[in-house]
Amino acid sequence: MRRVSIIIAVCAVLALGVGLIGQGRDLDTIMKEIGPLWGTPQAPGLQQALDAPTPDTAKIAADAAKLQSLFTEAEGQFTKLKMAEAAGMAKAESEAAGALAKEAKTGKIADTKAAKTSVGQCKACHGKYREPDPNGGFKVKAQ
């Protein structure tokens, strides 16, 4: 009887763990990672790194790859929310970040800077799909 109880407990813990892993992260969490990674006036990031006198292309490539992953995650969340246009915008940002990572890996600064112009089109989506929340942050606009 005791063995059966232990087996049931282990199965319950495993099921809970699999369920939590499958849920993924929410959009707010993803966006809060994208902002500082891309960069803001308060928190310099990838776009400022590209403008440095001697850009660290290895770090830029790694950051752009991370940005690509985050936008792919955001695309999935927008798809779950049935927001096709926002999902398309996130997909375009993901592809642009991937192109930026690829160019940065070559070490060619001019090509890397040229690829930067396709990334960071955040305002188009934010202007249409986000609104302030009562806590001073932002939330997805009701569709």
Feature names for model-found ranges:
Residues I21-Q143:
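Sequence context surrounding c-type heme c attachment/ligation sites in exported
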Residues I8-G17:
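Bacterial N-terminal signal peptides
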Residues M1-I8:
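Bacterial N-terminal signal peptides that target proteins for export
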